[in-house]
Each structure stands twice: as C-alpha cells, then as structure tokens.
C-alpha cells in the first residue's frame, strides 16, 4: 500500500507545478476550448527532465546491482542464522556500498547537469526561446537533479520496506510542491515559476536524506526490534471480498506447495 501511495503522490507531485501554472492567466493557454497547457513552462520542463536520464540509467545498470549484492548478503546472514559478527560485517559493507554508490551516482549526474546547463542555455536561445524561459531552464535543471536523487532515496527505502519513512517523504514532497507553487502563482507571480519547484525539491531532498540516514544508522533495530513478536495476519479488503464471494473456505497460495485450502476463522 505504501509503495502504491508513493507512486501516486510522487507522480502527482512532479506534475503539480505544471498543472498549477496551467491555471495562470498569463502563461496558461486553452486548446480547442478544453485542454490547458503552458507552452513556455512545459517545453523547458520537458528538456530539463531529459537531463535526469543518465542518473536513472547508472542507477539501474550499476548502482542498484552493486548495492543489491551487499543487501542480499546482509539478509542472508540474518536468515541463515549467522552470528553477530557476520551480520555486523555484512551491515557495514552494505552501508559503505550504499553511500559510496549513491555519491558516485550524484557526481556522475552532476556532470551531465552542468553539461545541460552550458549547452542547453545556448541551444534554447538559438531556437528563439524567450529569455525568461531560458533562465527558468537553468533553475529547473537543478530542481530535476534533486528529483533524481530523491527518487533513488525512495527506491532504497522501498528495499528495506520502510513504509512510514517512505510515506513521510512523499507526503512532504507532494505538499511542498503544491503549496509553494500555488503561493508562487497567486502571490509572487511569473518571476517565481520554476524557483518554487526548486525550493520544494531542495527541502524534500533534505528531509528524505535525513529519513534514510536515520533508518540506515539504526537498521539493526528496525530489522530485529521493529517486527512484531507474534505474527498477526493482516486482513485486507481483498480478503474480505474473497470471504463474501467464496465463503469461509478460500484457496490460498502456499509458498512451496502451491494451492491449498485453509479455513478463515
């Protein structure tokens, strides 16, 4: 459920600045009497988000695979009844790999952001994009850089099933993007377009980093003490629906033996 809400709120937070600026009387344009868009803002936002592709590629192809190896070894030491020294050694290796690969990905993306910053400004001016939009593109590039790092931090939290932390950072991200951009459109005016998105992302990234750091530094507590002492079956709405449709006996999927029948009491 947390992953679903994260996806919804993250996607909504990304598009909120665009949707809010579409309502601007000076920048918003109506197409065919129905659709709204803001040509200047949408164009530079699209090009700014293209700059995030290198980070996403390096994360999936390189960083995530290297991190997963240490992540797997850490939990193998736990589930295979390794002693404390084994678990602690795997934890230190995992944490070191995580921070090292995260720093490497940020440095790699920063080079491309600088490249887009230097070349993009010239290219946009060459194709006769307005100066205000070109200046906004520079700010949006840094905001998108923060978006990329924020997204990676969210994925790492998902690895550890840190649902509370994941929801916290996503709600903060969504509310800041909505609130600051509404304030920018209603109070600050056109000069704030793009900058409010940058501020929202900077604060969201700082908060997400703090949440991840606090979790990683206390990961043994969350893994061992954060679990319930006795298993309690979570009954969701799908289970309730199955009860109504099939009665007290439903088919369940066993992890090893396939389907079997169990009585729901």
Task: List the model feature ranges, each with a label.
Residues 29-38, 124-133, 160, 166-168, ...:
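Extracellular/periplasmic helix-loop-helix junctions in multi-pass membrane proteins
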Residues 42-124:
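Specific pore-lining/lateral-gate transmembrane helices of multi-pass inner-membrane transport
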Residues 127-131, 149-165, 213-223:
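Alpha-helical transmembrane segments
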Residues 1-16, 98, 102-107, 111, ...:
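Hydrophobic faces of transmembrane alpha-helices in multi-pass small-molecule transporters and flippases
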Residues 9-20, 176-189, 238-248:
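Hydrophobic alpha-helical transmembrane segments in multi-pass integral membrane proteins
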Residues 183-187, 198-257, 262-264:
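C-terminal transmembrane helix end/exit motif
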Residues 113-118, 135-160, 166-177, 193-209:
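Short runs within selected transmembrane alpha-helices of multi-pass transporters and secretion channels
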């Amino acid at each position: 459920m947390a992953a679903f809400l994260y996806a919804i709120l993250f996607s909504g937070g990304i598009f909120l600045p665009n949707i809010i600026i579409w309502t601007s009387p000076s920048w918003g344009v109506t197409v065919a009497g129905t659709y709204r868009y803001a040509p200047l803002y949408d164009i530079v936002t699209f090009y700014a988000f293209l700059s995030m592709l290198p980070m996403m590629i390096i994360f999936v192809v390189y960083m995530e695979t290297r991190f997963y190896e240490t992540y797997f070894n850490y939990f193998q030491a736990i589930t295979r009844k390794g002693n404390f020294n084994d678990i602690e050694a795997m934890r230190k290796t995992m944490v070191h790999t995580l921070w090292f690969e995260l720093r490497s990905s940020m440095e790699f993306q920063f080079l491309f952001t600088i490249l887009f910053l230097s070349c993009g400004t010239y290219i946009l001016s060459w194709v006769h994009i307005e100066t205000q939009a070109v200046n906004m593109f520079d700010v949006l590039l840094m905001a998108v850089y923060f978006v990329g790092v924020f997204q990676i931090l969210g994925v790492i939290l998902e690895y550890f099933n840190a649902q509370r932390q994941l929801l916290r950072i996503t709600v903060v991200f969504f509310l800041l993007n909505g609130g600051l951009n509404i304030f920018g459109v209603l109070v600050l005016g056109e000069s704030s377009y793009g900058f409010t998105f940058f501020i929202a992302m900077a604060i969201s990234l700082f908060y997400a980093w703090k949440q991840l750091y606090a979790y990683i530094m206390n990961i043994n507590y969350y893994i061992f003490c954060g679990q319930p002492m006795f298993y309690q079956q979570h009954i969701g709405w799908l289970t309730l629906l199955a009860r109504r449709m099939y009665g007290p006996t439903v088919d369940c999927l066993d992890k090893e033996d396939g389907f079997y029948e169990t009585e729901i009491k």
